[in-house]
Regions:
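Bacterial N-terminal signal peptides
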Residues: 2-12
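Residues on the lipid-exposed face of transmembrane beta-strands in outer-membrane beta-barrel proteins
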Residues: 36, 74-80, 129-133, 147-151, ...
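A contiguous pocket-lining binding segment that forms or flanks enzyme active sites
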Residues: 172-187, 195-203, 209-210, 216-218
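Repeated loop/turn-to-beta-strand initiation elements of outer-membrane beta-barrel proteins
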Residues: 83-86, 139-143, 188-192, 230-234
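Extracellular/periplasm-exposed beta-strand and loop segments of Gram-negative cell-envelope proteins
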Residues: 44-69, 92-125, 151-173, 201-214, ...
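Transmembrane beta-strands of outer-membrane beta-barrel proteins
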Residues: 33-39, 87-91, 144-150, 195-199, ...
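Membrane translocator/pore-forming domains, dominated by Gram-negative outer-membrane beta-barrels
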Residues: 156, 191, 272-274
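Short glycine/proline- and aromatic-enriched beta-strand/turn motifs that initiate or cap beta-hairpins
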Residues: 13-93, 268-276
């Protein structure tokens, strides 16, 4: 309800009479730029295997992810003199599904018999701090490049609905990324933009792990929008979120051999707003 209220309130600014920013004083050295998206997430592909003897599990075909999920994205950007961009992102991702095991399933050392009613949770929230330098400073357009540090907060649960069997995995780790973004003007108060952050890391420490696990991530979008009044912009956004990891951790949890394979491709469609 609060997200809907914020979006409606922002769109209502189209009827305002002033063109000055609603939140930033004219000529300020530092300016604040909130960004919010709400929409739907569609898993396109999603595979996972936990343990060398574990099942190569298809979340979409066998795990109930053949559906649409709610999507939200929260960002706050600070700009110094319009050139230095410092951003903070909260990206929730918590996919919970229920189905029955169509065949015997094994995750690490836990085995679920065929036809077991199952509950799955794939939680992969991430938090990101980004610095970018704008090469189009002094114009209404932006073209920025920089680096980011992302913190993954993963929670993977596989359990029987009767509570007798469960496999759970937790992981928190840093992931360095390269980042880019742009925003370009069109006619009649229209604009389009993009953002992207990603990395490919086959080497330990670079991928936020202490072992040679291959990891990759790409979070990229393209959007089109309208300039409203008082520095508000509304837009429609198409986003791709993909990546994963494969390898063996040399310090596994007790009862596990440390092997993990996890690759996914998600697409989101959202509407949103931001303030200049």
């Amino acid at each position: 309800m609060s997200a809907t209220f914020l979006l409606v309130s922002t769109l209502s600014l189209a009827g305002a009479t002033e063109n000055t920013s609603l939140i930033n004083p004219e000529g300020a050295t530092w300016t604040l730029h909130p960004h919010y998206e709400i929409g739907t997430l569609a898993p396109i592909t999603h595979r996972i295997q936990l343990g060398q003897a574990g099942t190569d599990f298809n979340f979409i075909a066998d795990g109930g992810q053949d559906n649409l999920f709610q999507f939200q994205r929260f960002e706050m950007w600070f700009q110094k003199n319009g050139r230095h961009h410092l951003g903070f992102l909260l990206q929730p991702c918590d996919l919970r599904t229920t189905t029955e095991a169509y065949k015997e399933l094994q995750f690490d050392s836990v085995v679920f018999a065929k036809d077991t009613p199952m509950e799955f949770r794939y939680g992969f929230d991430y938090y990101r701090a980004t610095y970018m330098y704008d090469w189009r400073q002094g114009t209404k357009e932006t073209l920025s490049f920089g680096m980011a540090m992302q913190i993954r907060n993963a929670t993977l649960d596989f359990r029987s609905l009767n509570g007798e069997l469960q496999n759970t995995n937790r992981d928190i780790g840093p992931v360095p990324l390269l980042a880019a973004a742009g925003k370009f003007e069109r006619e009649n108060n229209q604009w389009w933009g993009f953002d992207a952050a990603g990395s490919f890391a086959p080497i330990k420490y670079i991928n936020g792990s202490n072992t040679d696990i291959v990891g990759a991530i790409l979070d990229a979008s393209i959007r089109g929008g309208l300039h409203l009044q008082q520095g508000a912009d509304a837009f429609v956004n198409l986003r791709y979120i993909g990546g994963g990891a494969e390898g063996t951790d040399n310090t596994p949890d007790r009862g596990k051999d440390g092997y993990v394979l996890n690759w996914l491709n998600f697409v989101t469609l959202s509407v949103g707003f931001e303030f200049q």
